[in-house]
Design a protein with these regions (language model features):
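Acidic/His-leaning functional-site neighborhoods
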Residues: 85-99, 163-164, 199-273
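Short, hydrophobic/aromatic-enriched beta-strand segments in well-ordered soluble domains
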Residues: 15, 108-110, 125, 228, ...
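Acidic-aromatic substrate-binding/catalytic surfaces of carbohydrate-active enzymes
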Residues: 14-74, 80
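Acidic, contiguous internal or C-terminal segments within carbohydrate-active enzymes
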Residues: 110-158
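Extended, loop-rich substrate-binding clefts of extracytoplasmic carbohydrate-active enzymes
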Residues: 7, 73, 78-129
Length: 301
């Protein structure tokens, strides 16, 4: 199952076993489908970084120094891309197996074994009316406990009128090499999305604290809204806006809001921050829901 497409009267979804990624999620409309996620090339060779959404497992973002200590032992992780850091976990770079496929749902799984993390991850994709529900479970296969976290890295279309609403009470300053640094309580004006605001057109790569696990993205010019919710409510989201220095081919056509069960670099906080310690055989489950909503009075719906 390199690619699998699911659809109902509201949504069309394409998933790839390469990286466990979403390549397409569109709202089905009589006037033409609207991409709720950045459209990607529908190929099993599409890399996760060019997909519409990829999973973060066994934790997300970067780990400062590529090392952490837990229960008296130091673990070292090797960079897994051209980035200097072990980035976004293993799932987005792995080949997943399809272990179930139905008319409106499918489940992918893969296992990872290393000198540090050994685990099994599953993602279940379900079209439930006007919502896509993605449920990810990670199970610790090692014979020792380790801290785990989950999340997703979705790419959303950035249009001239796109707006974002996502509650936050603080954010982490970005340090050299894109590593999360000092936490600040006061949000910059152009990064305060407690009320609906347009997206800044500049480099942004920050985690936000005090989130309630819900966000709304509105594309007024298209008469479309997307509601992102998480269960349990994720306490952190990451906002990413690229630029042409980082990506010379960037067309200012997408942004990312990444729900995470933990903050970046939580391994270095006392108690592991919001990471979840999993004993051998224990598991952690997280759900992300993406709901398409037509704006009232929209003639395109």
């Amino acid at each position: 199952m390199p690619l699998c497409s699911l659809e109902n009267r509201h949504l069309a979804l394409t998933v790839s076993s390469s990286g466990g990624t979403i390549l397409q999620l569109s709202a089905r409309r009589s006037g033409g489908d609207f991409p709720l996620l950045r459209p990607a090339m529908l190929s099993d060779e599409t890399p996760a970084a060019q997909s519409a959404c990829f999973p973060l497992v066994p934790f997300g973002n970067r780990l400062k120094g590529n090392t952490f200590s837990f229960e008296g032992k130091t673990y070292r992780l090797s960079p897994n891309t051209a980035d200097a850091h072990y980035l976004h976990g293993d799932g987005w770079l792995a080949e997943w197996d399809c272990i179930f496929q139905g008319t409106e749902s499918l489940t992918l799984a893969f296992e990872h074994h290393s000198d540090s993390y050994c685990y099994r991850a599953e993602q279940r994709f379900l079209l439930a009316g006007d919502r896509l529900e993605v449920t990810m479970t990670v199970t610790n296969l090692a014979d020792y406990a380790l801290p785990f976290g989950l999340g997703w890295h979705p790419f959303f279309p950035l249009t001239a009128s796109a707006r974002l609403q996502a509650v936050a009470s603080g954010y982490w300053q970005e340090e050299a090499q894109c590593v999360a640094g000092k936490h600040h309580q006061n949000l910059p004006a152009d990064l305060d999305f407690c009320t609906s605001q347009p997206l800044p057109r500049r480099w942004v790569n920050n985690g936000f604290s005090g989130w309630n696990g819900s966000a709304d993205i509105v594309w007024p010019d298209a008469g479309q809204q997307l509601r992102l919710t998480t269960q349990p409510a994720c306490p952190v989201y990451f906002l990413f806006m690229s630029d042409t220095r980082f990506d010379p081919g960037y067309q200012h056509d997408f942004f990312c809001i990444e729900p995470m069960t933990h903050a970046a670099n939580d391994h270095h906080l006392p108690g592991g921050g919001s990471l979840t310690v999993l004993s051998p055989g224990a598991h952690l489950t997280q759900q992300m829901s993406l709901q398409c909503i037509a704006l009232c009075g929209d003639e395109h719906a």
